[in-house]
């Protein structure tokens, strides 16, 4: 029979030394389906020199190859002889690759680290969230939970079409833990909430059951509802890791996939994979969302206009509320409202990211954890495969920076500004690649009379034919669907970072340098044009130019001129009513909708206590709204006075750290490592992927020796207040010093400051 299928995901398993490809999909009648292909074998390529027959014989001696075939392929744009080596299973590729690399006359190994299901997707040009038509035979399989199962005979065609109605669900859960590190062996799940098209569903300990029954009810609900996509949201708690480990400690398996017996497991990209379903952590999508400076669920929901939960809790506060039976209702409501927000947010993002899935070709759950660099590289691999270009093996080097630091185009003008237009100049990078045909397969290292040459280093690039990068960008530019415009712009704007990513498959120092030389020349021309028109450039980075001093009409007129001169697509990305500039990559703006964007906030705040984080944000808000630095100074001084008077909660002074490897691999001088060791000595479970919260207590020893797990410090008088005072002064001075505030004036407290504090207290 001939059927059409909408693709969700791919997976495979080995049966009798034969790999079976599973195409998880929805058929044209709306049935959850699996299409099984048992005829596809893994392979990779080598290029060589010397006697071909001898090389083939040596390969056969060292590698269990099913078949070795001589083929023509491209290597950096040049036609070369290559050997296609086919193996029985994907795992054999790695063994063959290692042995072949030791043989003589092997010039290169290619395509050997392409995942098996990706290889399948590439060869048949099948992409998730698109359709394919195929000749299939319906079969009965006991091992699947899909409504239909088919054996593939032949793929006839593939095409884009309307997305069928997918069954989606949002999941939230809350854990009871009295201490500073979640322990799945002892800390129960007290509430598990789900939200779908059919409305809410919740299981809780308050119903007189234990969390073993909560987990079982959750599993039953997922199996009965049979969602295509499960949305979760939590970058801190690692939801599936906790659920699976908690279930394991209780003797339960989380078998909720569409392949019976396949438990939730860690996938290739580090995400948690559920066979036949897309398990999407929305945090992963939003971390890569350039327009958002934070990924807190409530903040994001507000930012995107989705009604968030009425409550806000830190995870370590749940136990305190749960211990009071009158407050349990609040926790239940908090969780169900979170599940609703997750469900709504997931469906909101689905409409945008489904288009990116089609372009890149990664399933949504994998896409959610893939960086923009990986997204671009996956797209380039597809483009290269179509042209017969060999795919280099990625050579990760942990001893060098992942990106080359780029030069600052102009020095930023530090200060507070009003009526700032932010120009998106990301189209410069696609222009440079298209205009000068920059690519790894067009780079010429010998004499070339008919090449483009970079302005400074004189690196040369063939004019014809179109290189890999230009071909890829031309494919994107041919898309006219308005729903895809945003994600295409994101891909293009990320190309600048990709070119400088030293662990990329096609990274080249020459390309990165030439790319900078060409693009900087154009950007400087744009800046000069802006200045000559009477406007002021206060900040410029790789993607944006911040302009002030003119009306919207004047800015639009200037943009039209720039675009016509260089065939660009420069546009106003955002208008800030006020903008605080601290340096080239540190700024904050207040938009017309009174939303505050803060650049580089997350990186700087990693090792700060909650109080310091909060005061920094309040200072930024004060400066942007009132534009009064004196008010910001008063805010710092009043915070310090309250701190010294003991007007704080211990929780405000907690610094959180995630333990990303075994403790014995860390430098013992780190405060959070000391705190973690002390927690273990006191009988608490602390392990890799745990979060540890610590405070600094009084004492004469070094700082790390005075770090204590926060749950072991109950008395305020044990805490080293002056350590936190210094932290607040140090961090707030980073914001205020560029605005003319010196350390002495910030730290000096006079009678007026104290009276102001008491006056504020009385007003309250």
From Swiss-Prot:
Record-linked Pfam families: DNA_pol_B (PF00136), DNA_pol_B_exo1 (PF03104)
Gene Ontology biological-process annotations: DNA-templated DNA replication
InterPro entries in the cross-refs: DNA-dir_DNA_pol_B, DNA-dir_DNA_pol_B_exonuc, DNA-dir_DNA_pol_B_multi_dom, DNA/RNA_pol_sf, DNA_pol_B_thumb, DNA_pol_palm_dom_sf, DNA_pol_type-B, RNaseH-like_sf
Family to which this protein belongs: Belongs to the DNA polymerase type-B family.
GO molecular function terms attached to this record: DNA binding; DNA-directed DNA polymerase activity; nucleotide binding
E.C. code: 2.7.7.7
Keywords: DNA replication, DNA-binding, DNA-directed DNA polymerase, Nucleotidyltransferase, Transferase
Catalyzed reactions per annotation: DNA(n) + a 2'-deoxyribonucleoside 5'-triphosphate = DNA(n+1) + diphosphate
Taxonomic path: Archaea, Thermoproteota, Thermoprotei, Sulfolobales, Sulfolobaceae
The protein's name in its UniProt record: DNA polymerase 3
Tree of life domain: Archaea
Catalytic class of the enzyme: transferase
